[in-house]
Amino acid sequence: MMGPPRTPLSKIDKSNPYTPCGSKVTEEKILVTVRMRPLNWREHAKYDLIAWECPDDETIVFKNPNPDKAPTKYSFDKVFEPTCATQEVYEGGSRDVALSALAGTNATIFAYGQTSSGKTFTMRGVTESVVKDIYEHIRKTQERSFVLKVSALEIYNETVVDLLNRDTGPLRLLDDPEKGTIVENLVEEVVESRQHLQHLISICEDQRQVGETALNDKSSRSHQIIRLTIHSSLREIAGCVQSFMATLNLVDLAGSERAFQTNADGLRLKEGSHINRSLLTLTTVIRKLSSGRKRDHVPYRDSKLTRILQNSLGGNARTAIICTISPALSHVEQTKKTLSFAMSAKEVTNCAKVNMVVSEKKLLKHLQQKVAKLESELRSPEPSSSTCLKSLLIEKEMKIQQMESEMKELKRQRDIAQSELDLERKAKERKGSSECEPFSQVARCLSYHTKEESIPSKSVPSSRRTARDRRKDNVRQSLTSADPTALVQEIRLLEKHQKKLGEEANQALDLIHKEVTSHKLGDQQAAEKVAKMLSEIRDMQKSNLLTEEIVVGDKANLKEEINRLNSQEIAALEKKLECVQNTIDMLVSSFQTDEQTPDFRTQVKKKRLLPFGLSNSPNLQHMIRGPCSPLSGTENKDPESNVVSANSAPVSFGATPPKRDDNRCRTQSREGTPVSRQANSVDIKRMNRMYKNAAEENIRNIKSYVTGLKERVAKLQYQKQLLVCQVLELEANETGAASEYDATDESQMDWPLCFEEQRKQIIMLWHLCHISIIHRTQFYMLFKGDPADQIYMEVELRRLTWLEQHLAELGNASPALLGDEPASYVASSIRALKQEREYLAKRVNTKLGAEEREMLYLKWDVPPVGKQRRQQFINKLWTDPHNMQHVRESAEIVAKLVGFCDSGETIRKEMFELNFASPSDKKTWMMGWNFISNLLHL
């Protein structure tokens, strides 16, 4: 004999242990099985078709006659084919539920289905099997004694009738606070044996109301309930538990029917209406219970059937439902309703517990002992407990003191580390101002952020990274984030600066050449060298002439740019400036030698006026003191030259001398007195000293200016070389060659994690800056974590970061300075976002079907009744930046509304925001960042 099958584990949700005098509570869903009968003789006579099939023992499929429609599948705990016997149906799902009544748990088994589907036939076989198994279990369990009682009733036209004693007439239903709903004056017979029980069940079947219809010769016209009350107890009483008591309900429901199929009239029509009404109430109760909403009202009292079975529907009982169906195509609608009822019943949860009967005397004694124990503990607390409490308090105090000492030590270490960090930062600042100036200039030139505003990598903790690692990360980020087009543009700009420096050097040489040729400063050889050098620099400028308009190529012209840079003589200008330096040194030395010759003294005597002055040389002063010079004239002068310039300021250096001074000199020379000769010699010495100081200052200023030009050219050359290295490394990354930084960083950085972090930050900044939701959808749907998306993610993040900072600065600025601009910026952006949502709301009806709209309204908690449901639905999109599922669903819905999903062509990421916008839908708010730029007047 087969053992009793167990309930599937999926049906049992939670189980609580036994209490000393309590019961075991088990939450379990209703067990639902489906039995399909074969075609009967009426259906064969009509040549009816079979519309259902069972591919496996848990699935039933509707074979739709229309081949265009997909078959409909239903899944249950167990499905029985027409060839299965009733014993298999019982053992497959009902046996375990029925035998649980022997262990003290209430149980209910009932059959549900349309008329003539085989309910009564199935329940007769199940009842016989239940009686057989009960007495078999009693025979095997000798240590317990069992007492069985049986009662039977039927509900006919909403009237309760006792099947064991029909003379009692209609019975009333009463509510008992402990037992629930009971039937007044219902006869309950004590079962003496198995044959006695079978005899009583046969009496109930004979007393039941049966009638003939067009679909069934013996159609049940009432609901029949046979109740077995099982009382079991141990033969040797142990503990306070004396016995178990449970009820087993065997319910044979009347079948639902349609009047046009049964051809019912008169009494049969009245019976059918009562049957359908009670079954409708049962279906409503099942659906209310399966919804899971505890606040919903469950209409148990609308029908006497549901009122009697209330304990079995969501209450203290285990329940098994056998749904019987017909395979005929003519009954397909009724079959679908039966399966729909079964699907709802699968979700109903019962809370079954073991019903234990406790002896009142023993229970009272047990409780008195427990109370006495508690009172004794309250009166005289044990000393051991107080000792334990004291030791526990001492232990806690020691732990607190230990933690305080650890906190002090940690604070001391933190202060030491902070002081060391401050010292290191100050040393780096001093060192960076002197030695790292070229690198900082390159960083400023490239305009790439290398501070904390860049996105940190979560793969390596910042506390463990050294300064060298951070420098490597910064270089790596600048290389990977640098666009080749931007690098080429920066190289061209550096060449433009080099051209300007060449022009300034040309001006310096031109001025030196003019002074040498016009005033004979130095020898003829030096003048020729200066002229030759000037012509060479001009030739070099002609060969390296750049157009005013910088043409920026794409990534494919990088090799041509590198070849052009390598073919150029980058250090040519530096060499020319070195020649200028040598020439100036030679001029200084020649000036010092010529100063000692008699010809020089004679020349000075003949020339009474200075040929030129520092204050009256506008070209030289503009060159030395111009804004392009790194050093000003006052910074290069020594104290002596300042005195000379101050003394020579009131002297006039015109083309003709003043007549008063000339006449005075002639008078003094004619008189020939020693006083006039002495004054003349003093004037000549003073003039010689002024001339010498002025010439030395001019040469010194030019020399310092040329030195500054050399330094700037060296810096520009360093910047160009660094940019070329960046271009080369970008090309190496394209061809797949991994450099040292790539090998170290790729092992430390996990791009998918970094992508998710960046996308979360971007979504939050979208929300804070009131960015267009269509722009958000475009970006979210296009960039999904590909390694090539890194540059786009960084650009978007920098845009949004700048926009947030810009709006914050406008918000913190003085209203007197800005007027209404901050409010207008935010108001314009919010107004544009509102217009965008209104536009999307207009497209809901055209882009979404009616069923899809209703499903979305239900999913997004849009009230079923109300105005502007479309606008309410759109206003809920893109409102929660912290919920990634909300963001993803919002993006999918907006993509459907705007038509991103309709286009079959592949969208290139380089054409972002150009391919998505259709010509007919070009609005100001659909221009993405262009609208933001116009809004901020950028």
Curated annotation (Swiss-Prot):
One of its GO terms (molecular function) is microtubule motor activity. PROSITE patterns: KINESIN_MOTOR_1 (PS00411), KINESIN_MOTOR_2 (PS50067). It comes from the Eukaryota. Keywords: ATP-binding, Cell cycle, Cell division, Coiled coil, Cytoplasm, Cytoskeleton, Microtubule, Motor protein, Nucleotide-binding. Expressed in roots, stems, flowers, pollen mother cells and embryos. Residues 641-652 have a biased composition (Low complexity). ATP binds at G113, Q114, T115, S116, S117, G118, K119, T120. Residues 29-348 form the Kinesin motor domain. The lineage of its organism: Eukaryota, Viridiplantae, Streptophyta, Embryophyta, Tracheophyta. Residues 450-481, 628-678 are annotated as: Disordered. PANTHER family: CENTROMERE PROTEIN E, KINESIN-LIKE PROTEIN KIN-7B. GO terms for biological process: cytokinesis by cell plate formation; embryo sac cellularization; gametophyte development; male meiosis cytokinesis; microtubule-based movement; pollen development; radial microtubular system formation. This is Kinesin-like protein KIN-7B. Interacts with ANP3. Interacts with TIO/FU. It is found in: Cytoplasm, Cytoskeleton, Phragmoplast. One of its GO terms (cellular component) is plasmodesma. Residues 658-669 have a biased composition (Basic and acidic residues). Its main location: cytoplasm. Probable plus end-directed motor protein that functions in the NACK-PQR (ANP3-MKK6-MPK4) MAP kinase signaling pathway, which is essential for somatic cell cytokinesis, especially for the cell-plate formation and its expansion. May regulate the activity and the localization of ANP3, probably by association through the non-catalytic region of the kinase. Functionally redundant with NACK1 and essential to promote the progression of cytokinesis and for cellularization (formation of the cell plate) during microgametogenesis and megagametogenesis. Disruption phenotype: Enlarged pollen grains containing four vegetative nuclei and up to eight sperm cells. Short siliques with low fertility. Residues 357-431, 555-590 form a coiled coil. InterPro entries: Kinesin-like_fam, Kinesin_motor_CS, Kinesin_motor_dom, Kinesin_motor_dom_sf, NACK_C, P-loop_NTPase. Belongs to the TRAFAC class myosin-kinesin ATPase superfamily. Kinesin family. KIN-7 subfamily. The gene is KIN7B.
